[in-house]
């Protein structure tokens, strides 16, 4: 399960009871800090995504000491006005104009972020013939490696 929370819920001493409540019931898998522009223009507070897995005797046995994945989004995805940023077609940089943006194989402009890699697959005959990576690996790919290393139940 994933929950988007204001950053203060992770840091404020007065919110310790919330953190304790969650930790008693779930394994904290990851905390991913989102860029402050993520929810603009509608809201501006810094937020993070908390990923948890409910304690379960079979799938997620309770342990007292375990590793947690931490990451921070560095590529904003939106500018200060809340307009989406796209990877520019040629060269490095960004644009707010989808017409000038790098696109995936379906013609969708690729948003400028580092949450996950944008990968196109050539599946002409129903099988993957070729994998074309449009953007670098991101936070999701790093989490997958972490989950495999930690032998989490959903990546065994």
List where the protein language model places each region.
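A conserved structural/catalytic subdomain of Rossmann-like adenosyl-cofactor enzymes
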Residues: 2-156
């Amino acid at each position: 399960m994933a929950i988007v929370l204001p950053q203060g819920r992770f840091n404020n001493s007065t919110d310790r009871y919330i953190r304790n409540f969650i930790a008693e019931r779930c394994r904290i898998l990851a905390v991913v800090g989102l860029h402050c522009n993520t929810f603009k223009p509608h809201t501006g507070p810094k937020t993070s995504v908390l990923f948890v897995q409910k304690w379960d005797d079979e799938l997620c046995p309770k342990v007292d000491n375990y590793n947690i994945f931490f990451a921070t989004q560095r590529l904003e995805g939106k500018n200060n006005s809340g307009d989406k940023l796209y990877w520019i077609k040629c060269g490095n940089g960004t644009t707010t104009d989808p017409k000038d943006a790098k696109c995936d194989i379906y013609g969708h402009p690729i948003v400028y972020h580092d949450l996950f890699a944008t990968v196109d697959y050539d599946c002409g005959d129903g099988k993957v013939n070729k994998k074309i990576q449009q953007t670098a690996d991101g936070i999701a790919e790093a989490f997958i490696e972490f989950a495999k290393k930690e032998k989490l139940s959903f990546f065994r």
